[in-house]
């Protein structure tokens, strides 16, 4: 065993190398005990640790007890050593993280890109979603954790593997779904559009039929509330209406995807599989449906023109939208509220989405911003005032 001790501010950082066993556990204990009690805590870098026995585990347990409420973390743990921590239960009582596997995407085919990162094919079985540097690691870890939860809860989604580092960026490895999105299928085979929209409605209903336990998933209402400060070009009073509107929205525990557009649903052997699970959460299903309404209608192209987001004529997008709601609700959208009172939230939630999406950043341009401001002032604010009476 070899160890190196350095200090990051008042935090003791211990780098471990080799094996820790009964023959050197006392030396290990003496080194840890020599760290000043006034330190902010202890960070153990196990990148070079090859093995640890029960004697070494007990030394770690004693060190953690000495730290009390202060920081005590073990990082960069190999799979072999992590197995020891898992089997013994230490991973449940200590803050322990695995070492990040290092890869390269040099020579790999780039098969997609989105707002948060790019997707590369690693091999015939796996892909890597490689995030842009601006995306925080905590957000990446959350998306992976949510994808795993979704899979366990019965939501059809791609199997996620590990968080890795590739060419200086962080990524997540997923199984490769050898299929096309519903959007691609519609564009390539419009004669079967109704069949594809039926799959679309079926998978949406399935997700919304799954209920989470309280606290099991983030609240989509909270996710939306956190986005309100990013809205620009509105007065403080107008911004307060966005908060007041969310206060009115019913809170339920139905599972939501957060962005159920036809480009986020793959079809493999006649079954749907969801991708991009970063906003997997709970709330009224009308949140998901209102985002579909927003992206296809309110943020869509003028009729007769080409919709560049969906890569098809706007007339086809309109057909998909109305057919989708008819299959989801079992009746045309115009009649949905009669049999499904919760459908009354569809347009108000779509107006809200207009504000939080079109008034954020400069992606949409002045014409869309003007439309969103008009919707806020002539539709959403009067709606909130009417509910308060």
PLM feature spans:
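Amphipathic alpha-helical interaction surfaces in cytosolic regulatory modules
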Residues: 20-94
């Amino acid at each position: 065993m070899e160890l190196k001790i350095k200090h990051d501010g008042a935090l003791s950082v211990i780098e471990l190398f080799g094996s820790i066993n009964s023959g050197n556990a006392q030396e290990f204990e003496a080194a840890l005990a020599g760290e000043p009690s006034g330190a902010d805590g202890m960070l153990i870098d196990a990148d070079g640790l090859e093995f640890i026995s029960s004697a070494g585990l007990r030394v770690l347990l004693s060190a953690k007890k000495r730290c009390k409420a202060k920081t005590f973390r073990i990082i960069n743990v190999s799979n072999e050593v992590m197995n020891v921590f898992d089997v013994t239960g230490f991973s449940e009582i200590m803050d322990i993280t695995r070492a990040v596997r290092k890869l390269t995407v040099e020579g790999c085919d780039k098969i997609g890109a989105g707002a948060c990162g790019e997707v590369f094919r690693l091999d015939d079985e796996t892909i890597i979603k490689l995030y842009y540097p601006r995306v925080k690691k905590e957000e990446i870890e959350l998306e992976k954790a949510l994808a795993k939860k979704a899979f366990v809860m019965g939501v059809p989604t791609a199997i996620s593997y590990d968080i890795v580092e590739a060419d200086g960026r962080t990524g997540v490895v997923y199984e490769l779904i050898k299929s096309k999105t519903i959007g691609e299928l519609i564009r390539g085979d419009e004669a079967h559009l109704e069949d594809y929209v039926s799959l679309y409605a079926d998978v949406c209903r399935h997700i919304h039929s799954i209920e989470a336990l309280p606290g099991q998933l983030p609240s989509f209402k909270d996710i939306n509330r956190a986005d309100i400060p990013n809205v620009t070009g509105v007065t403080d009073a107008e911004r307060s209406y966005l908060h007041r509107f969310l206060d009115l929205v019913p809170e339920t525990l139905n599972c939501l995807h957060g962005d159920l557009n036809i480009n986020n649903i793959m079809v493999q052997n006649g079954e749907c599989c969801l991708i991009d699970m970063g906003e997997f959460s709970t709330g009224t299903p009308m949140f998901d449906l209102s985002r579909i309404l927003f992206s296809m209608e309110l943020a869509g192209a003028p009729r007769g023109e080409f919709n560049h987001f969906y890569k098809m004529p706007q007339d086809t997008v309109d057909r998909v939208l109305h057919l989708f709601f008819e299959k989801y609700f079992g009746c045309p959208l115009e009649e949905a509220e009669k049999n499904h009172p919760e459908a009354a939230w569809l347009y108000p939630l779509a107006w809200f989405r207009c504000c939080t999406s079109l008034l954020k950043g400069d992606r949409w341009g002045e014409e869309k911003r003007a439309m969103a401001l008009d919707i806020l002032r002539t539709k959403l604010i009067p709606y909130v005032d009417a509910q308060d009476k």
